[in-house]
Amino acid sequence: LTAFLFVASIPAGQATFVDTVEAAYLGAALETQDDRMPPDRMQGVVSIRDSIRLAGWRNNKVFLSEVFQPHNWPAKYDMTLDHNIVSMGEQDFKLYVTTDGSPYIIDVSSCDDTKCTPVVSIDTPLPNIGCRYANASVMTRHGFIYASTMGLVLLTGTGAWHIITKKWFGE
């Protein structure tokens, strides 16, 4: 494993530097070597309350920033879903992800150095028909609501879903 260690501060106008610093006098290792900038062309960003972490998406990929480092989006947190993402909301450290197929609920409180678990996939096709419009879905105290081909869908933190307009509108 290679690490970049601090050797010296060099003035901006200095063209050369000869490294004669002994290993015992080297500074700390660079802690940002594995940092990654936010992925290009993210289509949306959601703030995860109380953890100072961000979540975003592009096509069918979910991206998470490091906790307390909104500038750092490590690849180790990247997740690929089966369908393209339309919208995302957050409540109680759960990401509600609607797609052009089935919705997902991602528990981001359990993210460690390798992955976030569990990712709950709702097996019923409930595509979001919000046409990628940011205000076509809403987070409420009861869960995440969005428009699907079956009516307004309410997703709860347990993974349960309900068509809340079913009694007023038939199929």
Briefly describe each language-model feature range:
Residues 5-10, 21, 57-58, 66, ...:
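Glycine-rich, histidine-containing beta strand-loop boundary motifs that form or position
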Residues 1, 5-6, 61-63, 87, ...:
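Ordered hydrophobic segments in well-structured contexts
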Residues 57-77, 107, 111:
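Beta-propeller domains
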Residues 82-171:
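Beta-sheet-dominated scaffold domains
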Residues 2-3, 26-30, 69-73, 111-121, ...:
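Beta-strand initiation motifs
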Residues 45-62, 66-67, 81-84, 91, ...:
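Carboxylate/His-rich catalytic cores and anion/metal-binding grooves
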Residues 1-59, 72-76:
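Disordered, low-complexity "stalk" and linker segments at domain junctions of extracellular
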